[in-house]
Swiss-Prot record:
Protein's name according to its UniProt entry: Large ribosomal subunit protein bL9
Organism, scientific name: Pelagibacter ubique (strain HTCC1062)
Gene Ontology biological process terms, A to Z: translation
Domain of life: Bacteria
GO MF annotation, one: structural constituent of ribosome
Amino acid sequence: MKVILLENLRRIGSIGEIIDVKRGFARNFLISNKKALYASKENIAEVEKIKSELSKKDTEKKKEAQKISEQINNKEYEIKKLSTENKELYGSVKPTEISKLILENDKLDIKPSMIQPITEIKSIGKFKVKIILHSEVDSEITINVVTADTIQ
């Protein structure tokens, strides 16, 4: 199925590009999230008209992502979790918890889908976490997991 991209997407394409993708990916992800349009003659003409406007919006999003990246890049956050004597956690640290932690500390709204732990966080220690803020901008933070004395 041919679609026209409305955003720059990593490993997929850039704004205004006509690409061929599987039908399910187009319907369930690209079109439903307003990242692409069906490649009809009318849509191609419409995208050509608004291509410069779309690239300006993308540039603004990129600048905003770079500002956020400068604020949180290489920063360390501490989270307290219950653990065993072997320093293993009861459960794990999820992206939603990391998102709430960043919101509480820096007042930045980072969606859990942007957060990608490099390794699964299931024990006490320091872990690197990658945050993808834009298709061209990402940041790395450190999560320091310490033992909690009581249940929170």
